Amino acid sequence: MRLPRNLITLGLGLTLLNAGLATAAEELPAPIRMVQEKGARILGSFDAPDGLRGYAAEYQNQGMALYLTPDGKHVLTGHLFDAQGKDLSREPLERLVYAPLAKEMWQKMEQSAWIADGRADAPRVVYLFSDPNCPYCTMFWEQARPWVDAGKVQLRHIMVGIIREDSEAKSAALLASKDPQKALHDHEQAGKASTLKPLAKIPAAVRKQLAGNMELMESMGAAATPAIFYLNAEGRMQQQQGAPQPDQLAEILGPR
């Protein structure tokens, strides 16, 4: 899954819980219930032209606009455009689906087992799912040095183990270290010369952290490392798969 760019705004609209409760208070028409029974979450309703009634749904982390016909017997799915080409589905989906979904995902990343890289009071936070054996994670670590060293950005490495057989044990070694931040810094700075050793026996608490990180990564549709999540200038959450190109760094990390 790749969250649609420029549609996900933090802080707008209701939370998923509140939106769900608001919709639950309504008596859903049969065609809308049919869509719900197929696995979609109905998160809210909205006004639509010409007697249509709009419903915002979420299915597998994607927004879906539903339009109930005036007779209440049929439902249309997809985007609705006016004569000027304006997408009338965009604002309701952003407000009722993508904004609260992004907020929920950001909160889950905040609560995950991450290792800080940079000052705690940095004005900008960037999350990335990181594997100790990932050369592109090291590349992004190096790319970000000017921003991190200047105190402008804090990277938060959500550790996972997916690349090699010893990746999980190496992530465990970092998380279980007496100083995870220094251990990660030393590992990334050394690059191929890193002396990081996989943990021979992963403590149950650390294994639980890694399992939670992996579950979160999968739920967010990330399939490779680094999977980078950040807020753009408008406060909208964006996703970057893999090490970014040089001309993308300012978008992800802010002004240098």
From Swiss-Prot:
GO terms for cellular component: periplasmic space. Belongs to the thioredoxin family. DsbC subfamily. It is found in: Periplasm. Its main location: periplasm. This is Thiol:disulfide interchange protein DsbG. It holds the Pfam family DsbC_N. The lineage of its organism: Bacteria, Pseudomonadati, Pseudomonadota, Gammaproteobacteria, Pseudomonadales. NCBIfam families: PRK11657.1. It comes from the Bacteria. The gene is dsbG. Involved in disulfide bond formation. Functions probably as a disulfide isomerase with a narrower substrate specificity than DsbC. DsbG is maintained in a reduced state by DsbD. Keywords: Disulfide bond, Periplasm, Redox-active center, Signal. Residues 1-24 form the signal peptide. Homodimer. Disulfide bonds join 134-137.
